[in-house]
Design a protein with these regions (language model features):
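Glycine-rich, proline-tolerant flexible connector loops at the mouths of alpha/beta enzymes
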Residues: 56-81, 103-121, 178-204
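Catalytic domains of carbohydrate-active enzymes, especially glycoside hydrolases
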Residues: 40-63, 171-176
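Conserved, mostly hydrophobic/aromatic
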Residues: 23, 47, 51, 91, ...
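N-terminal amphipathic alpha-helix/helix-capping segment at the start of soluble metabolic enzymes
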Residues: 1-22, 91, 221
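Non-globular sequence segments
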Residues: 104-168, 172
Length: 233
């Protein structure tokens, strides 16, 4: 009987997985100032022994204001990098599963309450929330704070932040990067004709709406080794 494709190896741009079971990134809301905690060692560590072909670390913000919540993981600072390196060191001491990471920016859906904290929705600025950004000054819903519409300087800065995070991923020895361009977060919102009402070269036509997301992809690809896979969700 032929082995089902699910259990056969697959080559992802040189990264050979022993099977096609991938553990998707799952937010844990357990970081402190973007830094991985002991919980991440336990959470990721036990998954690394599951027998899956690939483990992808949760949505990881490329800058502080790009976090979904204050408890989200980040990779914008040396402190973030050191904390995640310690988690990976502990895991790799005992497991050899390939490990990737999802890099993202929450955009207008950032600065929400930590799930399970007893409150829901956006956190007010005077209670620890922060300014959100997006392609246009349109809140995710009527209850959500209106984001500041990004100018080209903002976009250039975010592109650089993605590239810098990718460089940190190289130093961390990660095997794969997945860019988060779904769920209405920043890259996704630029693609949406509903969220993106811009009248410049970043809005309107599909070609224009893809301009910023493609700039992110290009910058990350340039910072990330060509023999390591890069994907987009």
């Amino acid at each position: 009987m032929q082995t089902p494709n699910l259990f056969q190896p697959i080559d992802l741009n040189g990264l050979v997985l022993p099977n096609r079971i991938v553990i998707a990134p799952m937010c844990q809301y357990s970081a402190v100032d973007g830094c991985a905690s002991d919980w991440h060692t336990i959470h990721l560590g036990h998954l690394a022994f599951s027998g899956a072909g690939l483990l992808i670390i949760e949505a990881t913000a490329v800058e502080a204001r790009g976090r979904i919540s204050a408890g989200c993981l980040g990779l914008w600072s040396d402190e973030n990098e050191v904390a995640l390196a310690d988690v990976l060191r502990r895991i790799r001491k005992h497991a050899n599963m390939p490990i990737g990471i999802q890099l993202g920016h929450a955009g207008r859906k950032a600065s929400i309450s930590i799930p399970g904290s007893g409150t829901r929705g956006p956190v007010p600025l005077d209670q620890g929330g922060w300014e959100t950004i997006g392609p246009s000054p349109l809140g995710f819903t009527e209850e959500w704070r209106e984001p500041r519409a990004m100018n080209e300087t903002d976009m250039d800065d975010v592109v650089v932040r993605f590239a810098e995070a990718a460089s940190r991923c190289v130093r961390l020895g990660l095997d794969l990067i997945e860019l988060h361009s779904a769920h209405g977060y920043l890259m996704s919102s630029f693609l949406s004709a509903l969220a993106n009402r811009r009248e410049d070269r970043f809005g309107g036509s599909l070609e224009n709406r893809t301009r910023f997301p493609l700039a992110v992809v290009s910058a990350v690809r340039a910072a990330w080794p060509s023999d390591r896979p890069l994907g987009v969700r």
